[in-house]
Amino acid sequence: MATKIKFKYKGQDLEVDISKVKKVWKVGKMVSFTYDDNGKTGRGAVSEKDAPKELLSMIGKK
């Protein structure tokens, strides 16, 4: 089963499949990421404690 990342962006509750995530980096206690949003680049962030371990393992990798 594919992992989904749930996060808030600009007041909206969003969810993205981890297979669409392109880049992941850490900012303080937050994990930020970009993802493919149907041809556009979407952005998201989730707290380190709420991030799935699959996302944490992608930090710094392309």
UniProtKB/Swiss-Prot annotation:
GO molecular function (one)? RNA endonuclease activity
Coiled-coil segments, which residues? Answer: none
What is the predominant subcellular site recorded for this chain? Answer: cytoplasm
Q: Which UniProt keywords apply?
A: Cytoplasm, DNA-binding
Q: Where in the cell is it found?
A: Cytoplasm
Task: Enumerate the Gene3D superfamilies for this protein.
Answer: 2.40.50.40
GO cellular component, alphabetical, reads:
cytoplasm
Q: Please state how the activity of this protein depends on pH.
A: Highly stable from pH 0 to pH 12.
Temperature dependence, free-text field: Hyperthermostable.
| Family named by the database record | Belongs to the 7 kDa DNA-binding/endoribonuclease P2 family.
Q: Quaternary structure? A: Monomer.
Physiological role:
Can constrain negative DNA supercoils. May be involved in maintaining the integrity of the genome at high temperature.
Q: What is this protein called?
A: DNA-binding protein 7
Q: What species was this sequence derived from? A: Metallosphaera cuprina (strain Ar-4)
